[in-house]
Amino acid sequence: MTIEWWQIALLTIYAGFSFYDGNNTTFGTVKPTMAGFFAGLILGDIQTGLIVGGTLNLLVLGVGNFGGASIPDYMTGALLGTAFAIESGKGAEFGVTLAIPIGLLMIQLDVLARFSNTYFQHRAEAYVEKGQFDKAGLMNLLGLIPQSLSRMLPVFLALVFGSVFVQGVVDYMPVWLM
């Protein structure tokens, strides 16, 4: 199966929205099971999506990012693992095998996204000191843009260039980075 451009677009948008959702509306789209289901729905194999997402959801149980700690992003792992499992026809086991290192790799991008978010937070603090609370709220929302992009860009690149690209990135990464 070849992943079509519209499927890449929907999965990329989902990756960005789910991060926003996890910090604001909390519809649950940030959960790996939901991400796997959505990817399976878009790509035509819901069962594989649920198996990949559900397996990754077991890894997330009891894990929280308290105090700003970065945790593996198994939502992105579920999206990409499901997509590659369906695309390759190798099954859910293959998808989970790819999804776990993808989730671990996303920790590093999460750190970069949080770092870039500090610009908006410093502006928000300045607006609060001036009593401009509406602008401070806007800065908090704008701070989600780099964080959403930290999910959207890897999903887009991985889906455009394929699982060989992702496996190559994971294989050439130093162990300390994971």
PLM region spans:
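Hydrophobic transmembrane alpha-helices
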Residues: 1-71, 75
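Juxtamembrane/transmembrane-helix boundary motifs in multi-pass membrane proteins
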Residues: 2-3, 24, 28, 44, ...
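Short helix-perturbing small/polar motifs within transmembrane alpha-helices
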Residues: 10-11, 15-18, 64, 76-116, ...
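Alpha-helical membrane segments and immediately flanking helix-loop junctions
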Residues: 13, 52-59, 67-80, 84, ...
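Membrane-water interface at transmembrane helix exits
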Residues: 18-23, 44, 60, 85, ...
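Helix-loop-helix junctions within the multi-pass membrane cores of secondary transporters/permeases
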Residues: 97-178
